[in-house]
């Protein structure tokens, strides 16, 4: 077994974690400390990882990478920081035997949603964990204007893929977002209903002045063939050039493929 411990202090250089939308303030100092070992199974075990910047911190316990440098398990992740959008993030992801529990008061998912919808080349297979994930977060920010309250549900992950999910959250005025995923043999059914479509649709720059409306999405995927349907109701639209209408559908289809872990592509509507 090879043991190590490293401490880094960063003050004059920039430092950021894009996935979490975390960025060090210009004149602040970030202290990174991590210790771990490499075991006989060729696994890299990070026993503790700590990032501290004033009142911001990221803490990880017993993070294990397999020989392919994929995350095979971890015991606990604690995040408490103000991100680059000035939003408060305070969540904990903790393992209890084979189940994981995500809890907390708030998390800004804006940057995460943007990455998922726009990047079809990103390798999402870095995590190799088969587990049940139970979620209970009081507030999820979708952007600077919209957020979900009491975001709860369960996700079942097998072979780096979501097999089952049932998630629900509330917008203000008692409007809802509901996502379900069910895989049976080779058929995967995905449904997404959003009472406030704007935080999703506005991310497509060729749609101008979209407001109000709800989004209803259904996808059935069997083997490599998927059939999807997207409906948007009761919305206002200032401008949508005719030549981009098909592009709109093609881009929104990316939601289905992201949820299926396949990258952005579409077969038919």
Protein language model regions, located:
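Membrane-proximal interfacial segments on either side of biological membranes
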Residues: 1-269
């Amino acid at each position: 077994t090879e043991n190590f411990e490293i401490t880094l202090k960063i003050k004059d250089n920039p430092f950021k974690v894009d996935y979490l939308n975390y960025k060090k303030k210009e004149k602040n100092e970030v202290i990174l400390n991590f210790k771990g070992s490499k075991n006989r199974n060729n696994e890299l075990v990070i026993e503790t990882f700590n990032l501290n910047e004033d009142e911001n911190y990221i803490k990880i316990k017993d993070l294990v990478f397999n020989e392919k440098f994929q995350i095979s398990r971890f015991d606990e992740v604690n995040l408490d920081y103000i991100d680059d959008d000035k939003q408060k993030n305070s969540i904990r992801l903790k393992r209890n035997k084979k189940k994981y529990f995500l809890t907390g008061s708030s998390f800004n998912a804006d940057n995460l949603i943007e990455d998922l919808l726009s990047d079809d080349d990103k390798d999402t297979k870095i995590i190799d964990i088969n587990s049940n994930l139970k979620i209970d977060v009081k507030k999820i920010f979708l952007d600077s204007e919209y957020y979900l309250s009491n975001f709860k549900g369960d996700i079942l992950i097998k072979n780096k893929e979501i097999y089952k999910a049932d998630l629900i959250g509330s917008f203000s005025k008692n409007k809802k977002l509901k996502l379900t995923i069910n895989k049976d043999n080779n058929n995967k059914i995905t449904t997404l209903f959003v009472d406030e479509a704007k935080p999703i649709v506005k991310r497509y720059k060729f749609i101008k002045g979209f407001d109000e409306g709800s989004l209803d999405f259904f996808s059935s995927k069997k083997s490599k063939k998927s059939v999807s349907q997207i409906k948007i109701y009761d919305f206002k639209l200032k401008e949508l050039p005719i030549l981009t209408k098909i592009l709109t559908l093609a881009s929104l289809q990316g939601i289905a493929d992201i949820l299926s872990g396949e990258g952005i592509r579409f077969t038919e509507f």
